């Protein structure tokens, strides 16, 4: 009974974590680009 819920939570968390990492990396890149100029 718990396995489908757990798999759903994992499948829901993976894209969110990937999106968060991508956004933070993008913001750091933007900040570094502004500092370099």
From Swiss-Prot:
Its main location: plastid. Keywords: Chloroplast, Electron transport, Membrane, Photosynthesis, Plastid, Thylakoid, Transmembrane, Transmembrane helix, Transport. It is a single-pass membrane protein. It holds the Pfam family PetG. It comes from the Eukaryota. GO terms for cellular component: chloroplast thylakoid membrane; cytochrome b6f complex. GO terms for molecular function: electron transporter, transferring electrons within cytochrome b6/f complex of photosystem II activity. It is found in: Plastid, Chloroplast thylakoid membrane. The chain crosses the membrane at residues 5-25. One of its GO terms (biological process) is photosynthesis. Component of the cytochrome b6-f complex, which mediates electron transfer between photosystem II (PSII) and photosystem I (PSI), cyclic electron flow around PSI, and state transitions. PetG is required for either the stability or assembly of the cytochrome b6-f complex. The 4 large subunits of the cytochrome b6-f complex are cytochrome b6, subunit IV (17 kDa polypeptide, PetD), cytochrome f and the Rieske protein, while the 4 small subunits are PetG, PetL, PetM and PetN. The complex functions as a dimer. Belongs to the PetG family. This is Cytochrome b6-f complex subunit 5. It comes from Chlorokybus atmophyticus.
């Amino acid at each position: 009974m718990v396995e489908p819920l757990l798999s759903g939570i994992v499948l829901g968390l993976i894209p969110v974590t990937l999106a968060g990492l991508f956004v933070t990396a993008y913001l750091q890149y933007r900040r570094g680009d502004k500092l370099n100029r």
